[in-house]
């Protein structure tokens, strides 16, 4: 039996003025994110691009990289070529922005039609501002399903009066570690997170 809790280390790349963050903040229908991710327990590392289309569907594309390339993967041919072909931003304009670490539990139902991830002990450091932050009392749960099927977990959350809230770890980390960034549309979510932490 494998480890039940896995550790992840992620570094998001963006332009110096955080255009990918701003696109999310401004609710652009189509947007992208670029990150390097290390699956610490297996030693695997990837360059990953997340694309969200105007139908609110997110698709991820990735290629393997060396762990040693984590902090400057765009200096290497494979990642640079991949990003040039798949990302709608000039590669030379991209810099490491926000790094995060967290622990994850992954649960899959027997029919493999439902996948649940539980992220905890989330910490951030901003490579641009040098500031760091942590949300040790916050747990982010994400449910992915194949089609519109009944979900036992959704019923449990409904019974507990827990309503879904959309949140991006990149955007959360940016807001918490960059006091100069615009964050008007995230203030309500930040208040909600603070309220949750105070009630624990």
Identify the function of each model-found stretch.
Residues 1-200:
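Phosphate-end processing signature that detects enzymes handling 5′-triphosphorylated RNA
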């Amino acid at each position: 039996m494998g480890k039940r809790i896995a550790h992840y280390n992620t570094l998001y790349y963006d332009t110096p003025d955080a255009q990918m963050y701003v696109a999310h903040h401004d609710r652009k229908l189509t947007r992208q994110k670029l990150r390097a991710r290390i699956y610490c327990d297996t030693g695997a590392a990837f360059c990953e691009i997340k694309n969200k289309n105007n139908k609110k569907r997110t698709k991820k594309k990735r290629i393997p990289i060396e762990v040693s390339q984590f902090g400057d993967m765009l200096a290497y041919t494979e990642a640079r070529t991949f990003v040039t072909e798949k990302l709608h931003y000039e590669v030379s304009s991209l810099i490491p922005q926000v790094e995060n670490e967290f622990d994850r539990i992954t649960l899959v139902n027997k029919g493999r039609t439902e996948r649940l991830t539980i992220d905890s002990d989330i910490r951030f450091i901003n490579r641009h501002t040098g500031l760091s932050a942590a949300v040790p009392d916050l747990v982010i749960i994400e449910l992915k399903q194949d089609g519109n099927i009944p979900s036992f977990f959704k019923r449990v959350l409904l019974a507990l009066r827990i309503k879904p809230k959309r949140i991006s770890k990149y955007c959360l980390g940016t807001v918490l570690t960059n006091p100069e960034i615009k964050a008007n549309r995230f203030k309500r979510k930040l208040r909600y997170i603070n309220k949750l932490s105070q009630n624990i």
